[in-house]
């Protein structure tokens, strides 16, 4: 149990509303700001809060958990995250980042990469030896299926491609929807729609989207992926298998504290889900843990206790399902749903 933050006074300055990147290291339930010249340096024994305020109130709040950080420190970080999220009107999408398994969005804040250093504030020493990870700001999605079509992130390589599916290569300012010669029309439409959704919701409509057919790859694709080899043949029967796998890889749970404890009730055990299942009065867990990620959706009319317990619910769910501790968590306020989240639902409105 962690001591709540006093109602009077805030440990965060008014500048948390300012655009740009804000980083704090957690020290004894207090956020200590990190100087700009030290952005990108993370100590394995510590936990951090990373806030990015983008245009049009598009804020993202990340909890970064060092591999050697203590449970107490992680809990304190969660308490501060709840306070900061409330201070910002619960606008931010929240993410839990585990050292070595950070999301592409998190990595994009640090174009020079991350530097991991040993030690932490609790251990009273900070070694200067560091290891740098490259900035992973490029993504590749495979779009596959006939009925339950799903985009799944793949390794950034021609080895991930085949002639029977569509792929989205997201390079930030340019988004390529590449369609194999044997891909079906539904996959092609899905790839186009998802590329446009990424442009509109994640790039504020400022990225360029290009539809590419097999054999007409632009120079930028070749520069990123290397010379194009002969690609694997696609198999239409795999689309049927993918439909079954995609449907079974996700489940939807309702969160309730009616009994005084947080309880989960499964409301759908396969996707695509009906969007009407997401009731504004409640919070929900979308379980895609078999693919390494779970989502918490917070209805705008859900009670304060349920909304503030989202991180706690996520941690408990990961433990209960025996998922990897590296499982990524994304907490979405109603109205801030990402294109990847929306693809689990039919007829999203």
From Swiss-Prot:
Among InterPro entries, the record links this protein to: ADF-H/Gelsolin-like_dom_sf (IPR029006), Gelsolin-like_dom (IPR007123), Villin/Gelsolin (IPR007122)
Residues modified as N-acetylmethionine are 1
> Which SMART domains has this protein been placed in?
GEL
GO molecular function terms attached to this record: actin filament binding; phosphatidylinositol-4,5-bisphosphate binding; protein domain specific binding; protein-containing complex binding
- According to the UniProt entry, which residues carry Phosphoserine? 338
Instruction: Give Gene Ontology CC terms.
Output: actin cytoskeleton; centriole; cytoplasm; Flemming body; lamellipodium; melanosome; mitotic spindle; nucleolus
Question: What span is annotated as the signal peptide, if there is one?
Answer: none
Question: In its UniProt entry, what is this protein called?
Answer: Macrophage-capping protein
Q: Which organism is it from?
A: Rattus norvegicus
Record gene name: Capg
